[in-house]
Design a protein with these regions (language model features):
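Residues on the lipid-exposed face of transmembrane beta-strands in outer-membrane beta-barrel proteins
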Residues: 41-43, 58-64, 101-105, 119-123, ...
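Gram-negative (and chloroplast) outer-membrane scaffold detector with strong preference
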Residues: 66-135, 146, 156-158
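Predominantly the C-terminal beta-signal and adjacent terminal strand-loop region
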Residues: 153-204
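Outer-membrane beta-barrel proteins
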Residues: 23-27, 47, 64-66, 103-109, ...
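Outer-envelope beta-barrel architecture signal
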Residues: 31-37, 66-70, 111-117, 160-164, ...
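Short glycine/proline- and aromatic-enriched beta-strand/turn motifs that initiate or cap beta-hairpins
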Residues: 20-66, 70, 195
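Extracellular loop and loop/strand-boundary signature of outer-membrane beta-barrel proteins
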Residues: 44-46, 83-91, 134-140, 173-178
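Residues that define the transmembrane beta-barrel architecture of outer-membrane proteins
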Residues: 35-37, 52-56, 93-99, 113, ...
Length: 204
């Protein structure tokens, strides 16, 4: 149900901004723009089966015209997550680590407000432990995971070099034995552009 609501919200927002098509960027035009190296932090808060946690990420890649970015990243949960209980009463705790390829496209801009599409696919492992009801470890191992994340992100320019960022989306995890690791994610943070900050100081 939560997944359906998130996907429906994304579709509704895309339909809404279509009415302001004069503010929508053509993705093919951005390839003609100046290229640059991009890098940063890609943390997102998420919910994994009764457990609120954070997936931490670092990325680097190439950007076009400050609108379109292709990224390579590493992502993981340094702490064990999830509260899965099987038919034998064993608790399964999980620790994720995966590499990813993704894109971000700032397709809509109206004055200081912007909307960005987010799509990322990865491959990695879930390092898990199984504990009995007494907390004793009875099994451990790792499973292949293929997470795919998609969502919409929003930004508001507080200053030319300082912006508020937020967003939401859904993470699908394959294969079937890892589907319980799927869930929504939300992002909230601040963006600081050092280059624009230095340009502002130089102009002063």
């Amino acid at each position: 149900m939560i997944r359906l609501k998130i996907i429906s919200s994304i579709i509704a927002l895309l339909i809404l901004v279509k009415g302001y098509s004069q503010n929508i960027t053509n993705p093919f035009e951005t390839f003609k723009k100046k290229k640059e190296i991009v890098y940063g932090i890609d943390n997102r808060r998420t919910h994994i089966y009764q457990h609120h946690t954070v997936i931490y990420g670092l990325y680097s890649g190439i950007g076009f015209g400050k609108k379109l970015r292709f990224k390579i990243g590493i992502n993981g949960t340094p702490f064990e997550i999830g509260k899965f209980v099987d038919g034998n009463g064993f608790i399964k705790k999980n620790q994720l680590f995966f590499a990813s390829l993704g894109e971000e496209f700032d397709f809509y801009q109206y004055k200081k407000f912007g909307i960005t599409t987010y799509l990322q696919a990865g491959i990695g492992s879930n390092f898990y432990r199984q504990l009995n009801q007494n907390g004793t470890e009875v099994n451990k191992g790792k499973e292949r995971i293929i997470p795919i994340e998609t969502g919409l992100h929003f930004s508001y320019d507080i200053l030319t070099y300082f912006k508020l960022k937020t967003g939401f989306g859904w993470r699908f995890v394959m294969p079937n034995n890892s589907r319980d690791l799927s869930g929504y994610y939300v992002k909230l943070g601040l963006g600081f552009n050092l280059k624009k900050f230095n340009e502002t100081k130089t102009e002063q």
